[in-house]
Regions:
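N-terminal amphipathic/basic leader segments beginning at the initiator methionine
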Residues: 1-38
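Short acidic-hydrophobic, aromatic-tinged amphipathic segments that line or gate anion-handling sites
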Residues: 33-40, 116-120, 326-335
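Glycine-rich phosphate/diphosphate-binding loops that line cofactor/substrate pockets in enzymes
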Residues: 41-59, 79-85, 222-229, 256-258, ...
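Short glycine-rich or small-residue beta-strand-to-loop segments that form or flank ligand, phosphate
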Residues: 53-64, 88-93, 231-233
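C-terminal non-catalytic interaction/assembly regions of soluble proteins
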Residues: 78, 88-90, 246-247, 251-360
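A glycine-rich helix N-cap at a beta->alpha junction
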Residues: 103-124, 286-296, 301-304
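Conserved, well-structured core segments that form the ligand-binding/active-site neighborhood
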Residues: 110-226
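Glycine-rich phosphate/diphosphate-binding loops and the adjacent beta-loop-alpha structural elements
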Residues: 196-206, 226-245, 255
């Protein structure tokens, strides 16, 4: 019997594990590496835009896949002769911290440095009963660009959720809120949204609901047998830059592993643990703060009574033992060997490629 190699994203590189063919392995993929779309997805957005109108592209960075769409969108703005000084690139991400966002996209968008606006760099003003960033209100054309992906605390965040979490609109918005629907329609928000291997575009009111339903169809995976061991990465850099931003993946996986089973999280955490608020919660085991990272941590802490967690990470082992009572390893091979010591080679190993919500 031979060995099969399985690869995982780890920071800016990839790491692999060799698993003997006599082990029961089930591989799941929701990575949808190819996004299929016709250029008309982009061109039709601008068909109703008049020359001289000011344009805001609200780019909410959620995966490495939408950067190419952003570049195509900017190329279309240029091809149609719209003035560069009328373009604003409203750039945000609630899935990674602001310093990493600025470094990542500052590089990608270098020629457009002067057009970039971050949510924390400008004032909000009241519009239709909600606090909204000035650049959104002051622009005549508003185009949202992102992906819908599952999140271990939020499930499937709506576009309204993502604008709120990123800081473009005030905190009063909740899902299904009439407030958001009214704002969406009054601002005539347009959008391009990636879901799995497909792309939606047009006015948000035309496709937002369908787009959320499609995300649930594509990323929710029903599991027949709960595994003894799950191995999953967090998407590599920048999504695995800190423990705070990676931990929600544990919650996505917990439905796919049996009680007493092991979730093996492969997350480099090159930038360490995360924000001060998160670090305080991690060491004090108090979860008063309402941040997304702390909510993910609380869920993981609750889960650890029933399931085990181990990590392949750059975070010192002593910290993982002290805070999460979990083991840290240098390689996926070492983590798996540890798993086999607990469950023997008869274990069912589930390998998950991409973000997925596992349910029974």
């Amino acid at each position: 019997l031979g060995l099969t190699e399985y690869w995982f994203r780890y920071g800016v590189t990839e790491v692999f594990v060799d698993i003997s063919d006599e082990v029961r392995v089930e591989k799941l993929s929701t990575a949808y590496s190819n996004v299929r779309y016709d250029y008309s997805v982009i061109s039709k957005i601008f068909d109703g835009v008049a020359e001289g109108e000011s344009i805001a592209i609200i780019f909410d960075y959620a995966s490495n896949r939408e950067v190419d769409l952003l570049k195509s969108l900017i190329a279309e703005v240029e091809a149609r002769g719209f003035e560069k000084n009328k373009l604003k690139l409203l750039t945000s991400s609630w899935r990674i911290n602001s310093k990493i966002l600025e470094e990542e996209l500052g590089e990608v968008l270098k020629p457009y440095r002067g057009c970039i606006v971050y949510p924390w760099s400008e004032d909000k003003t009241e519009y239709s009963g909600v606090m909204v960033s000035r650049s959104i209100i002051d622009s005549q054309v508003r185009i949202y660009l992102s992906s819908i992906l599952p999140h271990g605390v939020l499930g499937y965040p709506s576009i309204g959720d993502s604008l709120r979490l990123s800081g473009w609109v005030g905190n009063g918005l909740v899902r299904d809120d009439d407030c958001w629907l009214k704002l969406r329609d009054e601002l005539n928000l347009m959008g391009i949204c990636i879901v799995g291997d497909g792309v939606y575009s047009g006015y948000l009111y035309e496709f937002e609901d369908e787009c959320l339903r499609d995300a649930e169809r594509k990323y929710t995976v029903k599991i027949k047998d709960e595994a003894d061991i799950i191995l999953v990465d967090c998407g590599g850099w920048p999504w695995d830059s800190t423990l705070e931003d990676s931990l929600h993946v544990v919650n996505l996986m917990c439905g796919g592993v049996k009680d007493g089973g092991l979730i093996g999280l492969i997350s480099e955490c090159r930038e360490g643990l995360g924000s001060n608020v998160f670090i305080k919660a991690l060491f004090s085991h108090s979860f008063e703060e309402d941040s997304l990272g702390v909510k993910a941590l609380k869920r993981v802490a609750d889960l650890l009574g029933r399931k085990k967690l181990a990590l392949v990470t750059a975070i010192p082992r002593s910290i993982l033992e002290k805070t999460l009572h979990s083991k840290g390893f240098d390689t996926v091979q070492d983590l798996l060997t540890y798993g086999f010591r607990m469950y023997s080679k008869q274990a069912l190993v589930r390998i998950v490629d991409g973000l997925a919500w596992l349910t029974k």
